[in-house]
Amino acid sequence: MFKIVSKYVYSDIFEVIDSANSYEEALNLKHEYELSFMSAYTIEIVEA
């Protein structure tokens, strides 16, 4: 399982915003969130 984690640019707080069962699904979700949030957030994939 993989977690999609976001971090607001002006803060050090991380938040789990979604999860995925496969790495490929996690990459797709990460891409969608990056398109939605633009540069306001850093989006990362973390293996759980």
Task: Identify the function of each model-found stretch.
Residues 24:
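Acidic phosphotransfer microenvironment of two-component signaling modules
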Residues 2-7:
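A short beta-strand micro-motif
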Residues 18-20:
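Short hydrophobic alpha-helix segments
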Residues 13-14, 27, 31-48:
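Short, mixed-charge low-complexity intrinsically disordered segments
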